[in-house]
Amino acid sequence: MPSIITHAAVPLALWCAADRGRIPAWLLGPGVVAAMLPDADVLAFALHIPYADAFGHRGASHSLLFAGVLAVLAAVWAFFGSGRPWSAVSCQPRLAPATARPTVASTVQAAVFVFICAASHPLLDAMTSGGLGVALAWPWSEHRFFAPWRPIRVSPFAPQFFSARGLATLLSELRWGWLPL
């Protein structure tokens, strides 16, 4: 898998590349969380869930369905989240007047951005040189997919991340992940 740092780079790159204001600042945080969240499945190792299990590492949380669920949650949060620090009400932080209504555009925008951010995670993981692949089509298929081109070195888990192998992984991610962004 690429490191968690590289997964966070995708929403940051999208936000920076978009026309100013196209992706509001309040949406950046949820996008970064959505891009990193699938790797919370490493907790499966501590729970003795086998790697190859549907709920193991790179399993269900790396599916497009999971990205879709996060997108729906983002849309609901954007629509009903007035009064929250990053509410979609008029695409403004808490400064929006109480009479402002969330727009359909801001709700759809939240869903699309969060979906792209969450879906980027398994797509990047599928481009790595190791592991069992990603369960993109879960729950319809438990098949693990790899991209036909896999230039990114698989990231070691901590504490091995802070080693020569971890540095080689970061350089690989810089070359194949960050620079193209």
Task: State each model region's role.
Residues 1-181:
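N-terminal membrane-targeting hydrophobic helices
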